[in-house]
């Protein structure tokens, strides 16, 4: 498993399967308990979902944690496709997670608007694929990254998700 490989590589030990399972279970529980979503954001996504098909690409390694959290938060019903980097074997900005979501939705890159909060993982990955990208600066301001030649700028930048509806539904 990826977890076992990481433990072996980082700590130079070979864990027992029971230890790996205990670690995965602890991480799973902590993730599911920490993830929150305001009712305002859920309602916003439901309104956006009336006009757009929604999918999710996550750099999280554990699919089970994400799926459980999506159900708990009420997002499973509005997300048509979910891609978890742990399942794909690559993290954003690598092309594979983006290609996977495009395949699941049967869409071409130009037909997609990718919304993310990480300039490197989300904006660079989406733009390299040819998607329109929107950067949410609520958590990590664009200025905190150090772009180099060949990097892409987001097509639009918003301060928080409340601005997304205005941008997408106008």
Where are these predicted regions, by residue range?
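A metal-dependent, Asp-based hydrolase signature
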Residues: 1-26
């Amino acid at each position: 498993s990826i977890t076992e490989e990481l433990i072996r590589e980082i700590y130079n030990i070979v864990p027992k399967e029971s230890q790996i399972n205990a670690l995965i279970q602890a991480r799973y529980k902590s993730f599911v308990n920490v993830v929150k979503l305001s009712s305002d954001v859920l309602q916003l996504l439901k309104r956006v979902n009336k006009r757009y098909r929604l999918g999710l690409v996550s750099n999280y390694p554990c699919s089970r944690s994400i799926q459980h959290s999506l159900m708990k938060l009420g997002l499973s019903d509005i997300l048509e496709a979910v891609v978890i980097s742990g399942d794909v074997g690559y993290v954003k900005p690598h092309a594979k997670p983006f290609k996977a979501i495009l395949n699941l939705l049967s869409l071409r890159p130009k037909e997609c608007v990718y919304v993310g909060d990480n300039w490197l993982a989300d904006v660079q990955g989406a733009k390299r694929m040819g998607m329109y990208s929107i950067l949410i600066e609520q958590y990590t301001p664009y200025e905190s990254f150090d772009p180099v030649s060949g990097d892409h700028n987001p097509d639009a930048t918003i301060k928080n998700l409340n601005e997304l509806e205005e941008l997408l539904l106008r």
